[in-house]
């Protein structure tokens, strides 16, 4: 079926280009459907050149949203294993995902909170996001989340939160730093993995966090996209 659809699309385009027919205007982008075929968002057929141009124009963060958009008094404090923020209020999922851990106390971080979820779409699909410290979970393990899901609330405990890329299992109270070849520990050292998550948040409209001119430690694994 997909093959016949492609043939029909090329035929229509050829007729439009060489038969004097005006090609319909492209009104959206192609998206995969459940059967693995393609559907249009906007409902219009397109000249293939328009499809290629539209695909190139799509941002790398398509489908993701700033998870800290509703935090009151948000302040970006520093880059370390992840990114540290001050403020109070709701934290959303950055993209579609599945919760792998959610606890509000005694998880080895200041404030005790720890939430992880594995992204299931977009360029970061398969990677695990963590939010730690002064956060009370609003989700449970196994729950599916979207960019409209509040995963937890930052409370005014004096530590704020740290958020970034977690180890692949999503179950450890350590961040991605050991896997990234960094120096480990709790020191205030900026890491390349933390900087990568900061770049993601900035691309979504979040505030940039400082690294205070320090060298970024560790490496960025190949699985991590650029933003």
Regions found by a protein language model. Give the residues of each.
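A structural connector/turn signal
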Residues: 86-89, 134, 140
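Compositionally biased, intrinsically disordered low-complexity segments
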Residues: 10-13, 24, 118, 222
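Surface-exposed, glycine-biased beta-strand/turn segments
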Residues: 18-114, 146-147, 194-227
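Zn2+-dependent peptidoglycan hydrolase active-site motif and core
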Residues: 94-138, 155-166
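Conserved, short, structured surface segments that act as functional micro-motifs
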Residues: 116-118, 143-227
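Single-pass alpha-helical membrane anchors
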Residues: 1-17
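Short, surface-exposed loop and linker segments with low hydrophobicity and enrichment for Pro/Ser/Thr
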Residues: 1-4, 108, 154-156, 212
